[in-house]
Amino acid sequence: SPVLPEGVKNYLIDIDGTICDDIPNEQPERMIDAKLFPDALKTLNKWYEQGHIICFFTSRTEDHRSVTEKWLKKHGFKYHSLLMGKPRGGNYHWVDNHLVRATRYNGKFTDLIEKDAKIEVFDDGKN
C-alpha cells in the first residue's frame, strides 16, 4: 500500500456488531436487512470526506461479499476497500513491525479522543 500523506489515517472498520447488528456467518439471510447503528454512516463518511482511507475488514467470508457490498451501497457508505475473512470473535493478536492502533467500539461512533492505555509488547531486554 502507498505511504499516506501526513494526517491521513487508514481505518480498518469491522462490520457485524460495529456498524450494524452482529450477524453470524451461519445466518447470511439476515445480512441484507441488518440494522444500521446510529452515527456509523455519518462518522465513517465524514472520515472518508476528510481524506482518510476507509477499509471494511470483516469476519464475513467471500461467499458473503455480494450481500455485504449491496448492504453498504444501500446505506450509502463511502469506502475504499472491503477485506473478507478476518478471524472471528476477537480471536487474533496482531504482530507487526509497525505501530498498530486499535479502538474498541462501545456502541456509538463519535470523534476519537486520546487516552493512555497499558499494552503488551515483546521483551527486547531494554527494560
Which positions does each model-derived feature cover?
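HAD-like aspartate-dependent phosphatase fold
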Residues: S1-N127
